[in-house]
């Protein structure tokens, strides 16, 4: 049964508009079940074809030229059926994944509304508040909760978009084929159903006639071996023990097939000597969720018989491969607290590795398609929800009713779709040219750490509205720590880059921010190469796409003036997969990044975009910045060429040169990037000349150091543009 919409006196205000997921998760679960039935039918046909093929052609019943042709045709049909199996596994696991996302979002939203309603009840009964104060506090709480719910819906939509290139988890097909019957709906369990009728709890199992096995699948090729019982001969009549023994959970067969026969063994009778187990299992006082031990001992390569209380001790359910028991919860619900069997099969499953994420975008640990029915989402405690809501209210109240955030500016008629050059495939890339003389401290992407690992959130300015939304969704996002934090950090960086003090009104100038599936953050703007406005700093572990020394300069130049293409090329060169691209609605309107778009709202953008981090010289040329930092004030001129012969300052033409480089941005014609780079090169060379004169004539050490830093920066940019223009010729 799908999760219903929360109700209450303030529920509608906290949900509308856009604060509730209207999709029905049951539709996706039911469709996945229908495809599972199709998969079983296809598998039956495939098994029959394989058996007949082996019997007729490999058993020697038919041979010769015609037999070889028929054998080849049947083999081709078998391959097609196997491909169909793979497609069905993809469809089934995707539907279950989407259903899990919808279910989790609804559960989190319901928790938010319930927690807010409890807080409202407290406020309504608080005698210390007058009517106006009570009304203001309740409205603030309702507004913050609505914002949190809208953010949850948006994040769920982003994750759904990320799954459009979905690939099923490893072994998903095998798990689906092993699943013969789904567990009871809405009751997550780790106990594998017993092959026989269990006895009354507290008494030994009464032996009965063994069930004739089907065709058990043994771990090694060959015909199935008749199960060997621990005691040879006729089963011994059980002896009632002095004290009733609680039956233990039977061990799952090594490779599940049809149910294996039960061979009862009473506690007083010693079983036959089994093979030595890989890891002895310590009996637990009572069944409870715990990591699965090594497989229980089994006599030879036959199917494992159910374990009974004996010398080997009770065992918890597990599989020989150490993988989770098949009865796990749907996607996005695997780590909810309060559900029995949370750590089945050994610990909390980690998310997919980088290679998996690049293929599947989001692959939740429980999305293997194993469960046939949903598990009820475990709600976080009301205390946590209430705390999150109070935090949101406090933030919102401190910031006032309205937001003073700047609206941000985007270019006019400078869409990335216009005359967008395509990046070349990896095999067609030219070898990178010789690097600049000093590249000892090149800032390369570090896959071991994401941007949120090394960048404190306090270093990034944030608007009051965005801070309130982040605070309200903090509890719900705790399960996705890492990926969620990187996306949240990237959103704040994008908002800061679009703040009014980072935007001087230059025509067509704007920033795009992107985050990869492994948490790396990269930014790009529409002007020049390696261009960062004076005074702007970028946080650590945030990469500038056009200043990457590893990428051939001709590829960087092709993406000039197209920041969405720039971040795509950067990710492709480093074999990363973009998770989302962030910008304002105007900046993203005519672009198709191929991944989720996160649109910045006007109240997301802070009044000031001042960030603490690296200067522009540190970003584009870390070794030169380090050399400057190590140079004393008395030796600063050693970093510069000799002073110009003409002691008069050069005429400052930067204003006119800047106007010239803006002209190509008014066009959407093919080749505008080349014209823009030529004009930008002239501006960079002139800025370098002025910085050199200022450095030689400065009398104050601090002013001189700033001028030297400017000269080093423009020297690097000029050299980069020279190489880019030469490569374009």
From Swiss-Prot:
It is found in: Cytoplasm. Disruption phenotype: Inactivation does not abolish EsxA (ESAT-6) secretion, EsxA-specific immunogenicity and enhanced virulence. Residues 438-450 have a biased composition (Basic and acidic residues). Keywords: Cytoplasm. Residues 200-215, 236-255, 315-325, 399-410, 418-432 have a biased composition (Low complexity). It comes from the Bacteria. The keyword Cytoplasm applies. Residues 175-366, 399-457 are annotated as: Disordered. This is ESX-1 secretion-associated protein EspK. It comes from Mycobacterium tuberculosis (strain ATCC 25618 / H37Rv).
């Amino acid at each position: 049964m799908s999760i219903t919409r929360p109700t209450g006196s303030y529920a509608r205000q906290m949900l509308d508009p856009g604060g509730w997921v209207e999709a029905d998760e049951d539709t996706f679960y039911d469709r996945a079940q229908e495809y599972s039935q199709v998969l079983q039918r296809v598998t039956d046909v495939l098994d029959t074809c394989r058996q007949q093929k082996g019997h007729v052609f490999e058993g020697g019943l038919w041979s010769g030229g015609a037999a070889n042709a028929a054998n080849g045709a049947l083999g081709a049909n078998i391959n097609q059926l196997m491909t169909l199996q793979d497609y069905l596994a993809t469809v089934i696991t995707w539907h279950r994944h989407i259903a899990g996302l919808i279910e989790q979002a609804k559960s989190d939203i319901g928790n938010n509304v319930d927690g807010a309603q409890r807080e409202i009840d407290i406020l309504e009964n608080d005698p210390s508040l007058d009517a106006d104060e009570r009304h203001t506090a309740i409205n603030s709480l309702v507004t913050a909760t609505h914002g949190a719910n809208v953010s949850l819906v948006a994040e769920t939509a982003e994750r759904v978009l990320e799954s459009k290139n979905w690939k099923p988890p490893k072994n998903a097909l095998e798990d689906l084929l092993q699943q013969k019957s789904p567990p009871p709906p809405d009751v997550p369990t780790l106990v594998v159903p017993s092959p026989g009728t269990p006895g009354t709890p507290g008494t030994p199992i009464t032996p009965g006639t063994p069930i004739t096995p089907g065709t058990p699948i043994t771990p090694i090729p060959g015909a199935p071996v008749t199960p060997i019982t621990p005691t040879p001969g006729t089963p011994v009549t059980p002896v009632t023990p002095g004290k009733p023994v609680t039956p233990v959970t039977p061990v799952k067969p090594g490779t599940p097939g049809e149910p294996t026969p039960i061979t009862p063994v009473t506690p007083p009778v010693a079983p036959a000597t089994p093979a030595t187990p890989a890891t002895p299992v310590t009996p637990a006082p009572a069944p409870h969720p715990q990591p699965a031990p090594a497989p229980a001992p089994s006599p030879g390569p036959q199917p494992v018989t159910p374990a009974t209380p004996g010398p080997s001790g009770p065992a918890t359910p597990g599989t020989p491969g150490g993988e989770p028991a098949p009865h796990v919860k749907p996607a996005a619900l695997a780590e909810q607290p309060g559900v029995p069997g949370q750590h089945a099969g050994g610990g909390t499953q980690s998310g997919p590795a980088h290679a998996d994420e690049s293929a599947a975008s989001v692959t939740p640990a429980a999305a293997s398609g194993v469960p046939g029915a949903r598990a009820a989402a475990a709600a976080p405690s009301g205390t946590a929800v209430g705390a999150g809501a109070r935090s949101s209210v406090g933030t919102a109240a401190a910031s006032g009713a309205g937001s003073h955030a700047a609206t941000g500016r985007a270019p006019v008629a400078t869409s990335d779709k216009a005359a967008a050059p395509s990046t070349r495939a990896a095999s067609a890339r030219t070898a990178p040219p010789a690097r600049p003389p000093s590249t000892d401290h090149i800032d390369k992407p570090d896959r071991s750490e994401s941007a949120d690992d090394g960048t404190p959130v306090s270093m990034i300015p944030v608007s009051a509205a965005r801070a309130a939304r982040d605070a309200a969704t903090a509890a719900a996002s705790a399960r996705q720590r890492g990926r969620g934090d990187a996306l949240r950090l990237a959103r704040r960086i994008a908002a800061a880059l679009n703040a009014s003090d980072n935007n001087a009104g230059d025509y067509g100038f704007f920033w795009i921010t992107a985050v990869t599936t492994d948490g790396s953050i990269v930014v790009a703007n529409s002007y020049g190469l390696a261009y960062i406005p004076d005074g702007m700093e970028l946080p650590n572990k945030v990469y500038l796409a056009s200043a990457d020394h590893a990428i051939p300069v001709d590829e960087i130049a092709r993406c000039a003036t197209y920041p969405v293409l720039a971040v795509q090329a950067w990710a492709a060169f480093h074999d990363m997969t973009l998770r989302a691209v962030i910008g304002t609605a105007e900046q993203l309107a005519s672009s198709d990044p191929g991944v989720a778009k996160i649109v910045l709202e006007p109240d997301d953008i802070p009044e000031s975009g001042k960030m603490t981090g690296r200067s522009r010289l540190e970003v584009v040329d870390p070794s030169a910045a380090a050399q400057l930092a190590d140079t004393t004030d008395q030796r600063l001129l050693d970093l510069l060429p000799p002073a110009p012969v003409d002691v008069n300052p050069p005429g400052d033409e930067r204003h006119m040169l800047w106007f010239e480089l803006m002209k190509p941005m008014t066009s959407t014609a093919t080749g505008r990037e080349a014209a823009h780079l030529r004009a930008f090169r002239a501006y960079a060379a002139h800025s370098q000349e002025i910085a050199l004169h200022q450095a030689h004539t400065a009398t104050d050490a601090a002013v001189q150091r700033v001028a030297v830093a400017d000269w080093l920066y423009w020297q690097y940019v000029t050299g980069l543009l020279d190489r880019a223009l030469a490569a374009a010729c």
